[in-house]
């Protein structure tokens, strides 16, 4: 049974429609990535944020362990948080579809840390050093931004598997403050932040899992790469059909100091400041 919790959509503004169309184009491009670039993760190739799988995980005797490395300086990320009310049923669906085929050669995102990356005050490509006083000032500025944001009503548009093995949920906005607007407000609030950010201004996506190796040989008729790509497409399609149309409400903006590289993705060491969105649409 598909995970549906749909309600009739609210009207959206012209700017939101424009951003929704921009997201559709982005998601179409992401969907083509696996076919255009192949399954790079099967060759232990580059994964997210210019890192390789061996930078992120060790796979020994069928057991996956994240490689936690201290981030110098800590990354300072602003993310929207997806409550476990929504993430847990999605996580369960992901595991039902993918676990039988990958056993432990897969890393499932912690369902208590599902998030949407918005804006970095400092990231691994362009580190921006900050004192404790400056960090507290950044956090206060982010809190002020959150107080002016309206909670987002969002709907899962599609599931995508990238060539780097990241299984993503790609979302659209039904109502509330658009991600592009949130990022623009954070840019203004954090003037020292890197000019080049990691993601498109309109995108709204969250990681569900990372595939780390080949599917179980016992479930494959042959080790042929094209057959594996076909299997990946089939699994993505199964999950897509289960959870497409799933709706959620996002009402928290987090300011996160990631003391370990990709701490949010790998259950690493971090400090989280949680801010409720304060806008009332009444």
Give the location of each predicted region.
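Histidine-dependent nucleotide/RNA phosphoesterase domain, centered on the 2H-phosphoesterase fold
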Residues: 2-282
